[in-house]
Amino acid sequence: MTGWVLVALLAAADPAARERAGRASALLSYVAGDYAVAVGPRGEILSPEELAEQGQFVREAAAELRASSAEDLAGELDQLAGRVDARAAPPEVIGRAQRMATLIAQRFDLAVLPRAQPDLRRGQRLYRQACAACHGPDGTPPPAERLPLPTRPVAFASKPDMSRLSPQRVFSAATYGVPGTAMPSFGDALTLGERWDLAFYALTLAHKGARERARGEELLRKAPRTPDFLQLAVRSDDQLRAALSRSGLSPADREAVLSAVRAAFPASPGRASR
């Protein structure tokens, strides 16, 4: 046990090891978010391409951890890769991927939450500078014939496309890039705070209706509690919808509240990010 603790402390102090561990954690976040698109609740294959990608991501994450002297965590990912190959039910694979991403973040002291409230105005400016060319100024990517890329960029303006994404996943993509796509890493070009600003702004693009947002703000003023930016950072729109389903609000009002909380932070405990 002492040996593993020493290895963990040395790895956490090694910038190269932290970078590799960050990529591993990001890969597992993709698996947690997309495995249910590849495999159905009874183990049926929904998308062979997605399933192959999920297995590849887990194995790449294991390789990153072995290069970071985290053989114990890599061994657990070998087991997870076997469960992906066996088409295990989504709750099992998603839960294990999330747990492993958390363990990696804890061991290597990764920044998985914003240190202060993100700045949406700065996020908008950064989005226009760094993201609009591929993802579109309003979150709708240009037609494929105008932008020939190996994969279609995420449509941030699409509610269905964005339903499973959290700011944390967008932050990971901006930090480490996305394997097999044209999405580069902005880890060196943007500060940690700027990447969080960008991630939070991207989640607003599927909620652009001014009337819907105004209705949501009205409802939030009557709410006894509202989520802060730390809670919003790790939750996808679908997770927020599930929480709102217990509120007694109509479906339209739930969407309005979701729009409002993505656009502002009514209960923010911090100051603007640096």
Predicted regions and their residues:
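Extracytoplasmic electron-transfer domains, predominantly the class I c-type cytochrome c fold
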Residues: V58-R59, Q79-A88, P148-H207, F229-A264
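Short glycine/serine/threonine-biased micro-segments
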Residues: R121, C134, T175
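Mature extracytoplasmic or organellar-lumen-exposed domains after removal of signal/transit peptides
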Residues: D14-L120, R125, Q129-A130, E212-R274
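Short, small-residue-rich loop/turn micro-motifs
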Residues: Y35, D138, A174, V178
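Gly/Gly-Pro-rich "capping" loops immediately C-terminal to redox-active cysteine motifs
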Residues: G43-L51, G139-R169, R221-P224
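Hydrophobic helical h-region of N-terminal Sec-dependent signal peptides
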Residues: M1-L10
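Periplasmic/extracellular electron-transfer cofactor-ligation site
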Residues: P41-P48, R128-T151, P179-S185, A189, ...
